[in-house]
Amino acid sequence: MKMTFRWYGEGNDSITLKQIKQIPGCSGLMGVIDQYAAGEVWEESVIAEYVEHVHKAGLEVEVIESVNVHEDIKLGLPSRELYIENYIKTIRNLAKHGIKVIVYNFMPVLDWLRTDLARVIEEDGSNSLYYDEEELLGLTPLQIVENTSKSSNGFTLPGWEPERLKELENVLALYKNIDPDKLRENYKYFLEKVIPVCEECGVKMAVHPDDPAWPIFGLPRIAHSEELFDKILELYDSESHTICLCTGSLGSNPENNIPEIIRHFGGKNRVGCFHVRNVKYLGYRKFRESSHLSSDGSLDMFEIMKAIHETAPDTYIRPDHGRMIWDEVGRPGYGLYDRALGIAYLNGIWEALEKSSK
């Protein structure tokens, strides 16, 4: 297992590579290069510079996240051909510089969604990402975008890049005639084009679950349960077509048994990497993100790590969204301290599993 940390790049993150290097048991990054809009080719020179910078800090980078899929691909428009070709060029450029897993999603229009990016936790005074369906129902998509932008502490947020959202109302209208089956059909077309290239290059595509794990604003969503992921993997049978199994995204719905889902897909070698975090259920479709500690949330992190250890022991893991603690100010969900604590906790569980299995 390789324990990693998400990093947004020099000048685009409140955290330095030096700080990440000092986290015990963290071997590298799940990297992000967010200067490109969805549909653009990631230039090889930019990728090379990013990777070299990480290596000089004594860290690895074999996973790249947020290689966003253009909406025209999801909608199945004729213009998708250009954007698919650009995506293929990006895959090849990433593979040339040692990238083995590419994380993306196929969520229409809106990526992950919260109704509050800094809800104060009464028990300790920290704050974390929060979702309440009742609050969401009183807001329009445009209001959600505006609220998210205002609460980002000046940082771009993955899935909420300005260029993706400036035509929000127009794009939402285009999805009125797209149901889940049609979205899957368009997804299959995309996979049939890109997965053979991944096989050729030795790269895995890892699709991230819907977050939260249910439809929003009437948009089709096709990646938020074991059954739906079975359908996704049936679209193209290849070990290069995998899941980025995010425990917090799938775990936002208490009907999802996360250890069972891990064993189901990990046993088939169809998990490319893991985002591991905890959530606290507060009511129907209402939750906040907690520390990684099992007792702080609603997910059993020991059982989650045990399932990973049993079925995907050579995988990549990173702690996912953390609380903002100790007066830290940074990108919501992506501070240093709580995620570093998460790594220490998850590595402790892993060490116990390793030693008890011998």
Curated annotation (Swiss-Prot):
Q: Which organism is it from?
A: Lachnoclostridium phytofermentans (strain ATCC 700394 / DSM 18823 / ISDg)
Q: Which cofactor does it need?
A: Fe(2+); Mn(2+)
Q: In which pathway does it act?
A: Carbohydrate metabolism; pentose and glucuronate interconversion
Documented EC number(s): 4.2.1.8
Q: What is this protein called?
A: Mannonate dehydratase
What is this protein's gene name? uxuA
* Record-linked SUPFAM superfamilies: Xylose isomerase-like
Q: What is the lineage of its organism?
A: Bacteria, Bacillati, Bacillota, Clostridia, Lachnospirales
Q: Which UniProt keywords apply?
A: Iron, Lyase, Manganese
* Pfam name, any one: UxuA
GO BP terms: namely:
D-glucuronate catabolic process
- A molecular-function term among this protein's GO annotations: manganese ion binding
